[in-house]
């Protein structure tokens, strides 16, 4: 069964606050009238939910402070204006120190610059201390800023109830103002009357009259939720006035559930769970009894915490906090002290408080030598005409606020331009104000050794780390000992410390050009480079001559000049870190993106805005989050889109300022390219569809509104300024857009992607926005509550949207995916399709025959497979080349034999003549007994035998040579034939690849034409993205085909070459057999010992 998530957003409010206490209140503001600057004896209370601090005094209107906008409650506070101080002291006495102990300052704001200070004077110091403690307990309630629309309606009703006039009653006109931006005044007051409330403009009503049920009914009367009614009708199909249990189960599983989720870990909705939901939100007892949901119950469900747009458990600590520091994104600020522009801007201690209270965990201090007799170190933007603040005041503010909103470590990024004497003061103030909060030594189990990772955030809770240049350990040790003995000279050697300097006098020198300032800032941050060197004459970098005490306080954040990724790998020192201006960081990212990601797995990097951003604008942080950069520091004073992305992202994981990077950006065995379009190994790409249906309470004016939906993530996932609804004119209350869904077809990396809703007036002015992480997004019909530009919650403004989430499926694989996801359903659909085809007279066989015919036609186009005849001795003997050699050999043998025959004839004649001469005139008996004749015959026999043997040898030698020549000729012919076969196969393979490339080119052209003619793609960017996606899929498919062809061709070639090798082997064996035969015959002839003669 699907588990119910209990979203407990209420922090119990201490009874002391709900009971209330009488305080005096004073307010120091030029806009405030003199009558309002001091209020006596006001009863202050906090409501039971911890939404508001509200008060009312005799003869004055009631007022409220929304506690989600309260950033701090501070002890003390006395008026600077003498007139207000006079009023305060007349009522509370002239003992200012005692008065200060009884006072509290409540800071509220809707951005980080414009702070409103509410000062109250308590009856005594104990009450002040108790209220400060208790109020701090219920502020910074991250859950309360994410309550559902129905609770927000209740919250607004409570605000109206507390904003009473002098008589203690609620003005009807303030209620009417809630709905004035979309309806006529007459209609609003008519609806108020129908709700049973006074309808006169000047009328008032008691709290007892103005119940929440009446306000909720009035809301639905003035703003009828036709959008929800249409959805209700689509579920019931208009047949009844309720949703049955079966229909509700189907709706929850089909529409309200992410189909990508594992059904074991996240089971489907079933009868028991859906019955629980109906019982929770249905008020009609009869329908509840019948397990049915009415339209009213359906509205309550859709506007409840049960139906939040994101998984609400992500607001709590849900990430592991025991990984090395380098494995986390860290909420970071740039030039924290500035409340305005970078040049000529105002420096403010308050900015340190506000950024830390907002969850920032890395703040920057640009430290310079102080002026005047006390020479107190100051913080300012050097050479930029900015005002100055004292370093010790900044440190005090940091000590006060570092761990109010988060217990996880704070990193102080020092840009140190002070001489050694003043650096001693820097170290002393840090030691004095921070005490045990300052991490002065590395943790015992995390020493500063090469190859060891950084400690995890969980081991650095409530610790402050200093990022400042550090001396070499051996030098630091010696100098620290000398300093402790009082023997260290703190006078700076100008030659050794040319970089230390004083902040410029306003009239001393003109401000540097933005480019020079940027280059110099790069040098100060450790960026270096030619531009930095050129600017160094006018803009000094951080000092390298560090005081040993300050140096000894630096441990896990030791800045060094970046020397390249290879050098960083070689050193392998995790506690070394480098800072990069956004432009330098972008260059490294473009040139060595994978190396940059791997660098950030091991050690930390800090990115800061380039110096040309004089207006304190921000760069897009997403680019550097994609590379795994930890400290992507931004100008918190600018409530622009980059800051919205930053604060929207860091709202999750308890708002602690630390977010664990995705797994593949932490693992050493994984490489990740942030510019890749292809899916990441082990990560399933997603498809997201967003339909903007309607808005509620978008503006308090009758203006036209429209909504933009953007996505930010990897470059391939980022889609901005493309999806925009139509403009709904003159309705800021409840515009209905009902647009076609905006489809983000392929989200390669959902873990890094965020969805942004932006609501704008027709003039382009932003009315509200919301950042939602894609990995925590819930599918279905949801209400998205909006935030201000500075990401502060807005109670009533919201959008009603339908979000669909799917696994991304490339074109052509939809059926395959459907079959894998639901085999039975797919089989049933196929069967139904076949039955429908039969009903149309189309038999399955005919379709099969058509497919077979098409397949046969396709095969006809294909060339028949190559079949090579085996190369044998017989086939080679038929070759002309071999026959030519054979004829030549026959001729040579014939010539030799003729020569031998001629010699035999000549010898024969000679021997015959000699015998005839010897036997002439003799009888047979004489001849038989004549020794001379016998000797002559023996000599002739030997001569003839030797000649015949020689002839035979010469013939055998020629035959053997002929066999060798034939072997060589055959081998050459065989290699030629084999080479021809290989060439024929290579040509065939080349033709196959050429045909494949031609097919790819044709498909690419067809795809371009198809995308161009696709009417569903509205914008050029959408068409370009779709075309790129299709072409990538085509290329991937063709590369796979090419790979398969290559494998197939490789096998064919290997098979042919193996056959050739076998043929050569068989040929050599046959030739050797022939040679052996000749040799045996020759040896046999030699062993016979024949004596030959001619008779």
Swiss-Prot record:
Enumerate the Pfam families for this protein.
Answer: C2, PH_14, PI-PLC-X, PI-PLC-Y, PLCB1-4-like_EFh
Recorded superkingdom: Eukaryota
Q: Where is the composition biased (Basic and acidic residues)?
A: 852-863, 1007-1030
Entry-linked SUPFAM superfamilies: C-terminal domain of PLC-beta, C2 domain (Calcium/lipid-binding domain, CaLB), EF-hand, PH domain-like, PLC-like phosphodiesterases
Give the EC number(s) listed in the UniProt record. 3.1.4.11
A GO MF annotation of the entry reads:
calcium ion binding
Task: Look up the record and report any one GO term of the cellular component aspect.
Answer: inaD signaling complex
Enzyme class comes to hydrolase
Reactions catalysed, as given in the entry: a 1,2-diacyl-sn-glycero-3-phospho-(1D-myo-inositol-4,5-bisphosphate) + H2O = 1D-myo-inositol 1,4,5-trisphosphate + a 1,2-diacyl-sn-glycerol + H(+)
Segments carrying the region annotation (Disordered) are 487-529, 842-863, 1000-1030
Listed under GO biological process in this entry are:
adult locomotory behavior; calcium-mediated signaling; cellular response to light stimulus; circadian rhythm; detection of chemical stimulus involved in sensory perception of bitter taste; diacylglycerol biosynthetic process; entrainment of circadian clock; entrainment of circadian clock by photoperiod
PI-PLC Y-box domain boundaries: 550-666
Keyword vocabulary terms for this entry: Hydrolase, Lipid degradation, Lipid metabolism, Sensory transduction, Transducer, Vision
Please give the tissue specificity annotation from the record for this chain. Abundantly expressed in the adult retina.
Function according to Swiss-Prot or TrEMBL: The production of the second messenger molecules diacylglycerol (DAG) and inositol 1,4,5-trisphosphate (IP3) is mediated by activated phosphatidylinositol-specific phospholipase C enzymes. Essential component of the phototransduction pathway. Essential downstream component of a hh-signaling pathway which regulates the Duox-dependent gut immune response to bacterial uracil; required for the activation of Cad99C and consequently Cad99C-dependent endosome formation, which is essential for the Duox-dependent production of reactive oxygen species (ROS) in response to intestinal bacterial infection.
| Known partners and oligomeric status | Interacts with inaD.
Name listed for the protein in its UniProt record: 1-phosphatidylinositol 4,5-bisphosphate phosphodiesterase
* Source organism of the structure: Drosophila melanogaster (Fruit fly)
* Gene designation per UniProt: norpA
